[in-house]
């Protein structure tokens, strides 16, 4: 009988091979249990190692965000449909913080706050993902605002100019044209986009928070008709969405925009509106049993907006020189800008445009209140030509508003006050502008020059806008060199000013008012003395011209 010749080494290697190829069928993961759920909030027991702002996975693939880390439970905000979440269901950790996909493929698309497309045009191929909670650029990483961002709205570009990297608040009651101002600004970037120059191009992100679905659809339609969807992304969290989506939407929009900013590009983001985001965050906080403060808002509602708006910046040249310009919208009640959320956002932003209901109802649109509106940064980014012609515009309009109130009670006014009232009425008429019709900056300069230079003083108020429109049509057709000079040099030299005055005076001769009268001012002629009447010749003593020093 043959002996077995198995060595100890063979046995050892066989055992090692078997142990090395062994895989366990068990895995270790933290699992929690839903204690109660409702109104978009769930309390989960277990999950001792969960992080704040971590994503949790509920049954059916529904996601939630861990916000409250209590001693025995976790308070989570459910993102999406929460109707099927019930007590006793299991909840898993994902080990990830909330992030969204970003990239150029998002241009022209409509997405939800999770970065998922909702426009029915298929999936979006993302370049990378970006966390929603990111630190804003530090002081060292920024530079001062020095490039203009033209809105195409005369009243804003002349009196409250906006620079690239600035945060300009648009504030006013409902139905005063806040969204229209921002949509006009997006439409006005089309000319820059068509140049193909990355230094001029401005990508746009429109964040709709708590808006009606029809409103979001009409904004999208206006952008498509204006050719602006090519460079715009819409982040939509309509009124029908949960409070969690409304809270997250502005952060999603800023994450998409920051990707381009850190890539050296220029971006404009519109938050429409942050009042509804604050209300959604208040609802979440109250449901999570956080202690309420003023107007029942939680104590960190200021931080909610400050950490969002501080992401708007003009980056230093070392970081590529990109910029993110923010236009947050705040809705007031009865023109009260001293309420909690309005004062918070006013203190965070670099200026505000205040839209007033009374002006809107009077037909002054955009209904910007000059006295309360201000830009604390943009003046440094205003082009020189606009600075020259619009220097006295704000003062003239403010004086007009004061005199207008006084004139209602005064029976007779002196000649100076009457002239100020007449000039002011024409300036107000000049600054009116139809919706979705932004104006190039060179045409704005000519338009403002008409008013502040006194060229409209002889034109009846009701004919001011027709005079402006027909003059600009004439200049586009016959004097294109004037527009190109202002556009290229961004200055209004003495030669350009003289040529412009000459064109205006020549145009006036052929322009007739609505009553058929000429708008050329009559030359002032002094009456003759009685003893000179009937004489063949009259000697007139003229003062000797003074010598120039």
Curated annotation (Swiss-Prot):
Catalytic activity: ATP + H2O + 4 H(+)(in) = ADP + phosphate + 5 H(+)(out)
A Gene Ontology term for the protein's cellular component: proton-transporting ATP synthase complex
Compartments in which it is found: Cell membrane
UniProt entry keywords in alphabetical sequence: ATP synthesis, ATP-binding, Cell membrane, CF(1), Hydrogen ion transport, Ion transport, Membrane, Nucleotide-binding, Translocase, Transport
Binding site residues for ATP: 172-179
Function: Produces ATP from ADP in the presence of a proton gradient across the membrane. The alpha chain is a regulatory subunit.
Record-given protein name: ATP synthase subunit alpha
Species for this entry: Mycobacterium marinum (strain ATCC BAA-535 / M)
Gene (UniProt): atpA
């Amino acid at each position: 009988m043959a002996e077995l010749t198995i060595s100890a080494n063979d046995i050892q290697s066989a055992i090692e091979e078997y142990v090395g190829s062994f895989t366990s069928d068990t895995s270790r993961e933290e699992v929690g249990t839903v204690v109660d759920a409702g109104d978009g909030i769930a309390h989960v027991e277990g999950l001792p190692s969960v992080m704040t702002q971590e994503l949790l996975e509920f049954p059916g693939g529904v996601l939630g965000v861990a916000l409250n880390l209590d001693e025995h439970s976790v308070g989570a905000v459910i993102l999406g449909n929460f109707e099927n979440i019930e007590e006793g269901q299991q909840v898993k950790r994902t080990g990830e913080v909330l992030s969204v996909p970003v990239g150029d493929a998002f241009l022209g698309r409509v997405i939800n706050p999770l970065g998922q497309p909702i426009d029915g045009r298929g999936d979006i191929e993302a370049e990378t993902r970006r966390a929603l909670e990111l630190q804003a650029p530090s002081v060292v990483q920024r530079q001062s605002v020095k490039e203009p961002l033209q809105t195409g709205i005369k009243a804003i570009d002349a009196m409250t100019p906006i620079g690239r990297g600035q945060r300009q608040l648009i504030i006013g009651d409902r139905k005063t044209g806040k969204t229209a101002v921002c949509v006009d600004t997006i439409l006005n970037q089309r000319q820059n986009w068509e140049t193909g120059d990355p230094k001029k191009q401005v990508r746009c992100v429109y964040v709709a928070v708590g808006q009606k679905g029809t409103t979001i659809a009409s904004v999208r339609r206006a952008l498509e008709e204006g050719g602006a969807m090519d460079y715009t992304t819409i982040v939509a969290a309509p009124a029908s969405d949960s409070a969690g989506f409304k809270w997250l939407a502005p952060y999603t929009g800023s994450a998409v925009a920051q990707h381009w900013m850190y890539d050296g590009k220029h971006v404009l983001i519109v938050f429409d509106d942050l009042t509804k985001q604050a209300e959604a965050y208040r609802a979440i906080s109250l449901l999570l049993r956080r202690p309420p403060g003023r107007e029942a808002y939680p104590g960190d509602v200021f931080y909610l907006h400050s950490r969002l708006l501080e992401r708007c910046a003009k980056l230093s040249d070392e970081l590529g020189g990109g910029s993110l310009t923010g236009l947050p919208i705040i809705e007031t009640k009865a023109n009260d800008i001293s309420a909690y959320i309005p004062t918070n956002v006013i203190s965070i932003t670099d200026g505000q445009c205040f839209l007033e209901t009374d002006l809107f109802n009077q037909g002054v649109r955009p209904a910007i209140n000059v006295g309360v509106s201000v830009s604390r940064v943009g003046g440094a980014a205003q082009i020189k030509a606009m600075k020259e012609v619009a220097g006295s515009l704000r003062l003239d309009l403010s004086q007009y508003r004061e005199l207008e109130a006084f004139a209602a009670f005064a029976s007779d006014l002196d000649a100076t006050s009457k002239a100020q009232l007449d000039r002011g009425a024409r300036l107000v008429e000049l600054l009116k502008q139809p919706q979705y019709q932004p104006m190039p900056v060179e045409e704005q300069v000519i338009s403002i020059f008409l008013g502040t230079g006194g060229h409209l003083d002889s034109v009846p108020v009701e004919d001011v806008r027709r005079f402006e429109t027909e003059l600009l049509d004439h200049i586009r057709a016959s004097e294109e060199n004037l527009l190109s000079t202002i556009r290229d040099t961004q200055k209004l030299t003495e030669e350009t000013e003289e040529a412009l005055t000459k064109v205006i005076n020549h145009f006036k001769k052929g322009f007739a008012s609505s009553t058929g009268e000429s708008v050329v001012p009559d030359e002032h002629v002094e009456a003759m003395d009685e003893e000179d009447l009937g004489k063949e010749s009259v000697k007139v003593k003229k003062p000797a011209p003074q010598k120039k020093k």
